[in-house]
A protein has these predicted regions:
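Charged, often Cys/His-bearing segments associated with DNA-binding zinc-finger transcription factors
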Residues: 1-61, 132, 325-329
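Conserved short-loop catalytic and cofactor-binding motifs
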Residues: 16, 57, 71, 207, ...
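Short helix-loop boundary/capping segments at the starts of domains
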Residues: 30, 34-38, 75-79, 100-103, ...
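Glycine-rich, flexible loop segments associated with nucleotide phosphate handling
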Residues: 50-65, 147-155
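Short, amphipathic alpha-helical "recognition" segments used to contact nucleic acids or chromatin
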Residues: 62-77
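Short, well-ordered secondary-structure "scaffold" segments embedded in the functional core
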Residues: 82-106, 110-331
Length: 331
């Protein structure tokens, strides 16, 4: 039977099974504990209880084991029955233990999002030239050079936007099937948009949408553009052609696209290469998220749980990057 003490003796296995190191687990437990206790107090104090607080069977799994159970589920994405076999409990117990923890991890993930208040001040030194009206000079889709300086202190100079898709089980309802079918992936998917800075730290996550929705349509309806600091450079792939029209006063860096009879010239190819060298950080961030099988395998659960799962893992990935950046800053 799997237990925290047993796994702790094998740090390599611990990280392989949970997706995080023992130190990361302890830091996460310290954040989960006060929120879990507050949620339990609220639950026990609710009106209409049929049993007095403290009554009923006592669980043999403390909060540490419940968090471990949840992390195993997120990392390996086993069925509740399989997780129950690992921990020696029934699948209903797994569901009952992991549900509240997942909601707390989701809330912790949300807490890591957002742009820092000082982002605009940090970007001010690299503002594009202003026009006579005092605003930033409007940019064409590809007329601006991508930022070439990536600051080691994690300053937000660039907002890199991309969407990730995950396969879901096909619905029995035809209308739902049609909405979820992604022509790009040739499968039924759920799509989520991510926005990261040049360090790969996730600053914004959209609500998930059916896979048939185009990336640029998701961007326009997500509210992401309204939440961006006003002077930050927006960077995306060629699928987002047209966003420069949505924000004419912003600096926008998009790659050139070749067309029939109009191949890219060397300068355009170099421009695209420069953008790709910066955009790779969002691909690495998405890969870090998909290290957890719950975001890589066919998602078996309801859409509401999908949003909880991705936000929970976003928080884990962001905290790991924050820790790495802090080490680099201290070196």
């Amino acid at each position: 039977m799997l237990s925290y003490e047993q796994l702790l003796r094998k740090p390599g296995a611990f990280k392989s099974i949970t997706g995080i190191s023992p130190d990361e687990f302890q830091a996460l437990l310290a954040e989960v504990t006060p929120r879990y206790r507050a949620a339990e107090q609220k639950r026990l104090a609710r009106q209409g209880r049929q049993r007095a607080p403290g009554g009923g069977l006592k669980s043999r799994h403390d909060l540490t084991e419940r968090l471990l159970m949840t992390m195993v589920w997120l990392r390996l994405y086993l069925t509740c029955e399989a997780v129950g076999v690992l921990f020696g409990v029934d699948k209903s117990t797994v569901s009952r233990h992991t549900g509240p923890i997942l909601r707390i991890l989701c809330d912790l993930g949300v807490d890591t999002l957002g742009w820092p208040e000082e982002a605009q001040a940090l970007v001010a030194a690299t503002d594009p030239p202003s026009d006579s009206s005092g605003g930033a000079a409007p940019s064409e889709p590809n007329d601006g050079d991508p930022p070439s300086v990536i600051r080691p202190d994690g300053a937000d100079l660039v907002a890199i936007i991309d969407a990730t898709e995950q396969r879901i089980e096909r619905s029995h309802d035809y209308a739902t099937q049609k909405a979820a079918y992604s022509g790009k992936k040739k499968a039924h998917t759920r799509k989520t948009q991510l926005t990261v800075n040049e360090q790969g730290r996730i600053r914004d996550v959209s609500n998930s949408v059916p896979g048939s929705l185009h990336d640029i349509s998701l961007l326009r309806q997500s509210g992401t553009l309204e939440r961006l600091p006003p002077e930050i450079t927006v960077m995306a792939d060629s699928g987002y052609q047209g966003i420069q029209d949505d924000m004419p006063d912003r600096s926008v860096a998009l790659p050139y696209r070749a067309s029939r009879g109009h191949p890219l010239i060397p300068e355009q190819k170099l421009h695209n290469h420069d953008i790709s060298s910066i955009r790779v950080v969002i691909e690495n961030t998405i890969a870090a998220l998909k290290h957890f099988r719950s975001l890589a395998d066919v998602f078996r659960h309801a859409v509401e749980r999908y949003d909880h799962v991705i936000l929970a893992i976003v928080g884990i990935v962001n905290r790991r990057l924050d820790k790495r950046l802090a080490r680099l800053a201290a070196a």
